[in-house]
Amino acid sequence: MKRTYLSLIAAGVMSLSVSAWSLDGVLVPESGILVSVGQDVDSVNDYASALGTIPAGVTNYVGIVNLDGLNSDADAGAGRNNIAELANAYPTSALVVGVSMNGEVDAVASGRYNANIDTLLNTLAGYDRPVYLRWAYEVDGPWNGHSPSGIVTSFQYVHDRIIALGHQAKISLVWQVASYCPTPGGQLDQWWPGSEYVDWVGLSYFAPQDCNWDRVNEAAQFARSKGKPLFLNESTPQRYQVADLTYSADPAKGTNRQSKTSQQLWDEWFAPYFQFMSDNSDIVKGFTYINADWDSQWRWAAPYNEGYWGDSRVQANALIKSNWQQEIAKGQYINHSETLFETLGYGSTGGGDNGGGDNGGTNPPEPCNEEFGYRYVSDSTIEVFHKNNGWSAEWNYVCLNGLCLQGEIKNGEYVKQFDAQLGSTYGIEFKVADGESQFITDKSVTFENKQCGSTGTPGGGDNGSGGDNGGDNGSGGDNGSGGGTDPSQCSADFGYNYRSDTEIEVFHKDLGWSASWNYICLDDYCVPGDKSGDSYNRSFNATLGSDYKITFKVEDSASQFITEKNITFVNTSCAQ
């Protein structure tokens, strides 16, 4: 349903008088600005790892014609899109999803892809978290080949399908303009579907200085005139190289690059960027920063056939990173927290890892003499590590209370930082591939203010108190169990049950293991299984008809039992 919040608008640029008005839309925070990052899976992961934080929002893309990027990898040279992977990696973050018309907006408007629209909406709603749907993003961008009639008709249809499918409290519809300087002003109305069909107005913020901020200011005023919140859906310091500290005024080929100091770069692009949000604080409620090495992605790389973009990674320069962390730590920004979904107006707060937003910068930790343990980063951040003992390591996971993320190799160690609470007890675990086998170790630790937490009790890595608080049953995690066929009634030892077209339950019968820990995995996304009757089971978001690898692993005294298989998700129970 629509939510209306009172806001204040300045009566003039220098005036102190104000008038009350309202912002109308779905999933609009009462106060604050949602911080999200994009725009490909690996760039999001690199940002989260480099800054030691869980983003409040994560951004990715899908094509409507083939739904490429929805449930598997799709890369058109601009980085990997895989919404399923991103949603599973960040179960307690909002999703910001751009939907490309693939140049066929009129065919979309004619109804040719209505089945795909339903699949898309049902899949996104199945993740049970706030979803900001950027339908036909950059509606007026000439490179997209959109028609005003196709935009208007398709927007109205998608809005009505969201309601018809019962997803109106989960999916917010964003109408995003390109804010492209070469585009003449005064043309936005022809693309507008109507206020009743739009929740947010979005814009792109790349090089607004090229036209004295005219296009972004026009978009902001348009949102204000419609009483809609404003989302900076795509923003990046175009033509700047953060790592190399250069700038080019040439948008086509990036020629004649000028050297910049890190402070100059910040002052020229980042400071005006945040000032734009401050100047429009009555309507700005969210932004997505594209944190990517554009030059490393072949679509954007030399010879720059689609323009020169640069390198926007904030972690590529110490001052830029520090300034960024200090800025978004301010009170007006909405970072990741256990109340994030509630803050965004979602129906429940969800579960999973309890973030506290950006943890700020830290000095590189000193290597420890012990093989496996933790080190204190801050009162709310723990770093779990294991020394690299030369495994083949096709994959590795570092875990805190069952939340397992891929570790980074730093200073001869696999490391990963997590949100944590000083004084709490946690289960930490490390697992890594080693040829045809794997190495797994875990212990229980109490998080204290010291660099190398060596005191730990061996045992189940998922038995601590804290960290992942009920992520299996919350709105941000996987879907829990319940309903459908009881796995104990199945003749198969290991398989899956159909729960719905978007939910699969993986199970394995209990064969009498000691089982101080167990994990059930879907495509290498591993979480502790629930013991129900004589079976271990776990539900995941999935898409009917798709292929998956399912895995079960369990501790058995001093050893472990592991089994896996490839399956196609069909509408059946007790599938082997």
Swiss-Prot record:
Its EC number is 3.2.1.32. It holds the Pfam family AlcCBM31. Residues 23-293 form the GH26 domain. The keyword Manganese does not apply. Completely inhibited by Hg(2+), partially inhibited by Mn(2+), Cu(2+) and Pb(2+). Unaffected by Ca(2+), Mg(2+) and EDTA. Residues 347-360, 456-485 have a biased composition (Gly residues). It is an enzyme of class 3 (hydrolase). Keywords: Carbohydrate metabolism, Cellulose degradation, Disulfide bond, Glycosidase, Hydrolase, Polysaccharide degradation, Repeat, Signal, Xylan degradation. Disulfide bonds join C368-C452, C399-C404, C490-C574, C521-C526. It comes from the Bacteria. The carbohydrate binding modules (CBM) bind to insoluble beta-1,3-xylan, but not to insoluble beta-1,4-xylan, beta-1,4-glucan, beta-1,4-mannan, curdlan, chitin, or soluble polysaccharides. Catalyzes the hydrolysis of beta-1,3-xylan into oligosaccharides, mainly xylobiose, xylotriose and xylotetraose. Converts beta-1,3-xylotriose into xylose and xylobiose, converts beta-1,3-xylotetraose mainly into xylotriose and xylose, converts beta-1,3-xylopentaose into xylobiose and xylotriose. Does not hydrolyze beta-1,4-xylan, beta-1,4-mannan, beta-1,4-glucan, beta-1,3-xylobiose or p-nitrophenyl-beta-xyloside. This is Beta-1,3-xylanase XYL4.
